[in-house]
Regions:
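N-terminal amphipathic alpha-helix/helix-capping segment at the start of soluble metabolic enzymes
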Residues: 1-39, 43, 47, 58
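Conserved, mostly hydrophobic/aromatic
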Residues: 30, 55-56, 110, 146
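Active-site mouth loops of central-metabolism enzymes
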Residues: 38-55, 114-138
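Glycine-rich, proline-tolerant flexible connector loops at the mouths of alpha/beta enzymes
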Residues: 39-51, 66-93, 153-164
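N-terminal active-site wall of soluble small-molecule enzyme domains
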Residues: 80-99, 105, 111-126, 141
Length: 165
């Protein structure tokens, strides 16, 4: 199988170069909190800040002006739950970003349940045991939501077995 996307997409092609280092191999992390209204510096991550809906386009625009075209988004939902995972905020943010920038940038999205769950774990539990089936199903639903929003890639960071085959 020929991976057409590598050949037809300059940004992805540059990310996979082996013999030289180019700016397109760098990925800017973006942290977006659903309920945050003020920029907050993230301890231990230099000048990275937790962003919010009203400043995300301006922030990405500034990064693009500085030559950054690859971004990975880490969403922090307002409400934590172990049984209800609403991704409309995330999907709408992605749609907004893609509408503004189109194929000028690549957007990857972190996939894990840890920011969604009340426990902060990468999975759902049934009693004291990991519920693999429900965890994988929920993560699949979240990934599909990101794709509907226009994410160019999904970056599974979950420590749960079975996420990546």
């Amino acid at each position: 199988m020929i991976l057409e996307r590598l050949h037809n997409n300059e940004i992805i092609n540059n990310m996979s170069l082996e013999s030289k280092f180019v700016r397109d191999q760098l990925v800017q992390p973006i942290f977006i909190h659903e309920d945050e209204k003020n920029e907050t510096t993230i301890p231990g991550l230099g000048k990275n800040k937790i962003l919010f809906e009203s400043n995300i386009i301006e922030t990405i625009s500034d990064d693009v002006k500085n030559g950054c075209r690859n971004f990975i988004i880490f969403f922090v939902p307002k409400t934590k739950s172990n049984n209800q995972f609403i991704t409309s905020f995330q999907e709408n943010i992605l749609l907004k970003i893609k509408k503004e920038f189109g194929s000028e940038i690549e957007i990857w999205v972190d996939l894990c349940l840890c920011s969604f769950t009340t426990s902060g774990h990468c999975c759902l539990f049934e009693g004291e045991k990991i519920n693999y089936a429900d965890s994988l199903e929920i993560m699949s639903d979240i990934a599909l939501s990101y794709v509907r929003g226009g994410a160019d890639g999904i970056a599974p960071s979950s420590m749960l077995n079975g996420i990546v085959h």
